[in-house]
């Protein structure tokens, strides 16, 4: 005979949700930081190909 599972508490549900939201917020913060550093030209971990036209303009 089918028996329903025990209900998990709201506290556990909220804790799992908070952990998930925290990880998402951290990933979003890293993405924003990386985007800002790329836009300002301060990114050290990227190598950009330089076109010949850009070299002649400078």
From Swiss-Prot:
Keywords: Ribonucleoprotein, Ribosomal protein. Transmembrane segments: none annotated. The gene is rpmF. It comes from the Bacteria. This is Large ribosomal subunit protein bL32. GO terms for molecular function: structural constituent of ribosome. Belongs to the bacterial ribosomal protein bL32 family. InterPro entries: Ribosomal_bL32, Ribosomal_bL32_plant/cyanobact, Ribosomal_zn-bd. GO terms for biological process: translation. SUPFAM superfamilies: Zn-binding ribosomal proteins. GO terms for cellular component: large ribosomal subunit. NCBIfam families: rpmF_bact.
């Amino acid at each position: 005979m089918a028996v329903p599972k025990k209900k998990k508490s709201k506290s556990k549900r909220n804790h799992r949700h908070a952990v998930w939201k925290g990880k998402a917020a951290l990933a979003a913060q890293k993405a924003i930081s990386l985007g800002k550093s790329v836009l300002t030209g301060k990114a050290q971990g990227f190598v950009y190909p330089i076109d010949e036209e850009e070299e002649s303009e400078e």
